[in-house]
């Protein structure tokens, strides 16, 4: 049986919020089978638990934001991406602010945190959402689409008119049957343009943003002294985001995802469109791990690692 997973022990870290610039404490705790990924605002007088779900995403302008009873947890996508890549089904995430810390701007720190806690299989079947009919969302020239596929593969195309991005490639296709999330995707950092960062700071945003947690570009080049971690780091980061955005549906998808200039809003709209059509998906489990898609059928190894 392909089993659900959680972590073996509690782990903690401290970072800063990308937009607030304030210190945030993050604690990951093991969770029982069928709990899902649950964020908890432990800094509030009465802590609020917010289970990750497509319907709980309330704001997608700068990040994916979970909302419930007036409480918010923002910038969840990198941590959710790490959970997807490592096959974590059940986890409590305690946070002392309304923002998950940005760490180094990628999912790499969260992968390290989860791996250092250890991954434990649980005595319950891992549930997948198997897409059975195509689903698509369009917004002008942008689109995001899910097609039936026995596995999980993604194709993402960006369109940033910038010399540095043009040089590194605007499109990427990855099938996790033969690609390592940890090696090939997890370390891709978020990126932004210097003039946009200044504008955001004037609005009280991006106070924690720096070259320690983002790739920063001027009109012509990358300003970071250490350059890029991957030749195609820009599009890889957008794929990292998409993996995290899609994982808020509550289970790993068995599907082919294709997107052009998609972002947090379009990704969430795609999930809602899928859930609105009950004939376009089904929940499946695998009693025989050998019959599960490659990339998920590891007994003790991480999901796409």
Swiss-Prot record:
Cofactor(s), by name: Zn(2+)
Q: Where is the active site?
A: 264
State the UniProt keywords alphabetically: Hydrolase, Lipid A biosynthesis, Lipid biosynthesis, Lipid metabolism, Metal-binding, Zinc
Name the pathway it acts in.
Glycolipid biosynthesis; lipid IV(A) biosynthesis; lipid IV(A) from (3R)-3-hydroxytetradecanoyl-[acyl-carrier-protein] and UDP-N-acetyl-alpha-D-glucosamine: step 2/6
Q: Mention one GO biological process in which this protein takes part, according to its record.
A: lipid A biosynthetic process
UniProt similarity note: Belongs to the LpxC family.
Biological function = Catalyzes the hydrolysis of UDP-3-O-myristoyl-N-acetylglucosamine to form UDP-3-O-myristoylglucosamine and acetate, the committed step in lipid A biosynthesis.
UniProt GO molecular function: metal ion binding; UDP-3-O-acyl-N-acetylglucosamine deacetylase activity
Q: Single GO cellular component annotation? A: membrane
Q: Which reaction does it catalyse?
A: a UDP-3-O-[(3R)-3-hydroxyacyl]-N-acetyl-alpha-D-glucosamine + H2O = a UDP-3-O-[(3R)-3-hydroxyacyl]-alpha-D-glucosamine + acetate
The UniProt record lists the EC number as 3.5.1.108
Name it.
UDP-3-O-acyl-N-acetylglucosamine deacetylase
**Entry-linked NCBIfam families:** lpxC
**Top-level EC class:** hydrolase
Amino acids binding Zn(2+): 78, 237, 241
